[in-house]
């Protein structure tokens, strides 16, 4: 038997927090996982598999919601220059997955929106910012739209999902799908503990929460997402070289 101590780490400055706390195991989004693969030798033990998900490697997505009366907003490209509302800057499906959709359409996600209002999981929340007109559009994470409807926090017909994917999945989405939550070991974890945790997780029954832990793939897509956003393993792409500066300002330099 092993004694387990649980420590909650803030997503902001995750790498520094991990180095400070020195955990052997982490549970996080796929985005944080691929970041720590390259930085600290993270190794997947298992990934969450939920009943409602298409598959463990295609389970997490985002929706863009607008007020139903905003007839000027019909497509994701109509959102350029508008005000966005989201949960946290580093929230995987509450922010990054949605911004990846912007990048996939050839836009710079850093400048696409004129302003972003973050709710930080407090009130006013994302739908409220959109409802009162403080934001033009909001990003919601996996199945959050359906949960808000079920609990009565938003009403049917009050909001509209932009470019909803036409599929038979349990939850609507506007974006690509990515792997679910990952349980992984860091390079410092003792081998016998990694073995014990692996056996425990992979043999754990679904239970009342209707999910289980399984081995999963699909992380190449997460690398592509993080590269398009210049985050995580690709944060170095944000370093501007002289050549980059000249190319991005060549019009001004010629005047």
Each language-model region and where it sits:
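An extracytoplasmic/periplasmic, membrane-proximal ligand-sensing/linker region
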Residues: 1, 174, 189-255
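Bilobed "Venus flytrap"/periplasmic-binding protein-like clamshell domains
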Residues: 1, 54-128, 143
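A ligand-binding cleft/hinge motif common to bilobed small-molecule-binding domains
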Residues: 27-41, 98-104, 131-132, 136-165
């Amino acid at each position: 038997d092993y004694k387990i101590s649980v420590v909650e780490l803030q997503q902001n400055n995750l790498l520094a927090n991990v180095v400070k706390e020195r955990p052997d195991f982490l549970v996080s989004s796929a985005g944080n996982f691929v970041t720590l693969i390259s930085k600290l030798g993270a190794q997947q033990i298992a990934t969450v598999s939920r009943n409602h998900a298409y598959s463990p490697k295609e389970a997490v997505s985002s929706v863009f919601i607008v007020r139903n009366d905003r007839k000027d907003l019909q497509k994701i490209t109509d959102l350029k220059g508008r005000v966005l509302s989201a949960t946290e800057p580093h929230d995987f499906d509450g922010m990054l997955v949605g911004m990846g959709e912007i990048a996939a359409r050839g836009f710079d996600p850093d400048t696409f929106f004129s302003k972003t209002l973050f709710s930080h999981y407090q009130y006013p929340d994302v739908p409220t910012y959109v409802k009162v007109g403080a934001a033009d559009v909001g990003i919601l994470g996996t199945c959050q739209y359906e949960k808000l409807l079920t609990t009565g926090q938003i009403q049917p017909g009050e909001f509209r999902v932009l470019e909803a994917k036409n599929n038979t999945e349990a939850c609507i989405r506007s974006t690509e799908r990515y792997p679910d939550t990952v349980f992984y070991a860091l390079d410092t974890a003792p081998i016998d503990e990694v073995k014990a945790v692996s056996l425990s997780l992979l043999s754990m029954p679904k239970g009342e929460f209707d999910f289980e832990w399984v081995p999963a793939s699909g992380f190449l897509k997460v690398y592509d997402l993080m590269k398009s956003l210049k985050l995580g393993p690709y944060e170095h792409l944000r370093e501007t070289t002289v050549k980059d500066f000249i190319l991005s300002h060549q019009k001004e330099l010629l005047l």
